[in-house]
Amino acid sequence: MSLFDHSVSELHKKLNNKEISVTDLVEESYKRIADVEDNVKAFLTLDEENARAKAKELDAKIGAEDNGLLFGMPIGVKDNIVTNGLRTTCASKILANFDPIYDATVVQKLKAADTITIGKLNMDEFAMGSSNENSGFYATKNPWNLDYVPGGSSGGSAAAVAAGEVLFSLGSDTGGSIRQPAAYCGVVGLKPTYGRVSRYGLVAFASSLDQIGPITRTVEDNAYLLQAISGLDRMDATSANVEVGNYLAGLTGDVKGLRIAVPKEYLGEGVGEEARESVLAALKVLEGMGATWEEVSLPHSKYALATYYLLSSSEASANLSRFDGVRYGVRSDNVNNLLDLYKNTRSEGFGDEVKRRIMLGTFALSSGYYDAYYKKAQQVRTLIKNDFENVFANYDVIIGPTTPTPAFKVGEKVDDPMTMYANDILTIPVNLAGVPAISVPCGFGANNMPLGLQIIGKHFDEATIYRVAHAFEQATDYHTKKASL
């Protein structure tokens, strides 16, 4: 039995009782990485020397003081979250050898909690993708079946947890990039409310949509990790000054009287029968525990995909303009003048998907098209947000599938961008509205790949999401299933 089959609270107890050491946990990670990483390819950079040194330092503290719950726990960090002195590439050749000079706020908080960073995790380049096939280095594979994608863009973060390489990880979610890979890899992934977790030190893709969040094996562990990284940060102008409650207190298993809304758009056209049936089965479980559900409508959901790609690509066009070969990152050698420097550095450094989105965003922001595309997309975004507010006036949570289907095979959709984009039709509306949502395992498809249940909550009401997710998790056994590599 792996140490990582235990929960955070169980491992914390074992550490305090000196049944195990922090070094044991770190070595568990690196041994598992040595065994499976050649196949999974979840990591881009390992930090073995520093991790082992930190483990020895923490071992000396066991029993000497009151250590927090995350003390000594091994974590993986998505490679678009900056780490001081530890290579951060965003899975892009343009940042292939970039060593940041500061830590992201979430990394500072994790260090303060005495977690140990095992390494940096693979992803779609600059978080643009749904399969991890857009990594500038190599594609991560799904631990449940190496012929399948792990999802994206936080594919490395989800795969590392599913493969038992780390206890938990951090990802980022712009249009589903935590929840979709969590669903595909059979783990738990939460996108917090926009502003709940500081974005300081997250390399920006789309600043009005990006949010850092936890990926774990269980809902309880997810709540522990969110508790540690949440809160106001003066270094992030979009960080919200909203009290962080005790997420663990609500994990009682009680959902009696809970009012669930199920959007007809989330079970209709484009959603596979397996995903639909898994949600209906989950609703029966929750109904049996005293919750009630009704069908509702989110009428503007049909515009979410187009709205998202216009807005996110427009923001990416602006955010990625900083990668020009002048200040940091790779610089082209094929240069005769300043224009060559900009053009050749970006042409050589960015992958095809990143270039595609930069071009789309630049077009949407260009003179003569701004009102027709970008401004109109912002107006539709407001309508989508209003849809959620109208539903939440009468219901506690919204439930539906995380993805339309289980994971697909490597290479199956890589040459068809529109088909690839459609994988996010159920997760994107959440980002546009800024509300929180979690994906928890809820079954398997005919291809024996995991399915995810998406539970969406009101702004800053992660506590209710966790309560529902935990109740469902404890009433079923999907969270006990493991990928067998």
Swiss-Prot record:
<keyword id="KW-0436">Ligase</keyword>
<dbReference type="GO" id="GO:0030956">
    <property type="term" value="C:glutamyl-tRNA(Gln) amidotransferase complex"/>
</dbReference>
<keyword id="KW-0547">Nucleotide-binding</keyword>
<comment type="similarity">
    <text>Belongs to the amidase family. GatA subfamily.</text>
</comment>
<dbReference type="GO" id="GO:0050567">
    <property type="term" value="F:glutaminyl-tRNA synthase (glutamine-hydrolyzing) activity"/>
</dbReference>
<dbReference type="InterPro" id="IPR023631">
    <property type="entry name" value="Amidase_dom"/>
</dbReference>
<feature type="active site" description="Acyl-ester intermediate">
    <location>
        <position position="177"/>
    </location>
</feature>
<feature type="active site" description="Charge relay system">
    <location>
        <position position="153"/>
    </location>
</feature>
<dbReference type="InterPro" id="IPR000120">
    <property type="entry name" value="Amidase"/>
</dbReference>
<keyword id="KW-0067">ATP-binding</keyword>
<protein>
    <recommendedName>
        <fullName>Glutamyl-tRNA(Gln) amidotransferase subunit A</fullName>
        <ecNumber>6.3.5.7</ecNumber>
    </recommendedName>
</protein>
<feature type="active site" description="Charge relay system">
    <location>
        <position position="78"/>
    </location>
</feature>
<dbReference type="GO" id="GO:0005524">
    <property type="term" value="F:ATP binding"/>
</dbReference>
<dbReference type="InterPro" id="IPR020556">
    <property type="entry name" value="Amidase_CS"/>
</dbReference>
<dbReference type="InterPro" id="IPR004412">
    <property type="entry name" value="GatA"/>
</dbReference>
<dbReference type="GO" id="GO:0006412">
    <property type="term" value="P:translation"/>
</dbReference>
<keyword id="KW-0648">Protein biosynthesis</keyword>
<comment type="subunit">
    <text>Heterotrimer of A, B and C subunits.</text>
</comment>
<dbReference type="InterPro" id="IPR036928">
    <property type="entry name" value="AS_sf"/>
</dbReference>
<dbReference type="Pfam" id="PF01425">
    <property type="entry name" value="Amidase"/>
</dbReference>
<comment type="function">
    <text>Allows the formation of correctly charged Gln-tRNA(Gln) through the transamidation of misacylated Glu-tRNA(Gln) in organisms which lack glutaminyl-tRNA synthetase. The reaction takes place in the presence of glutamine and ATP through an activated gamma-phospho-Glu-tRNA(Gln).</text>
</comment>
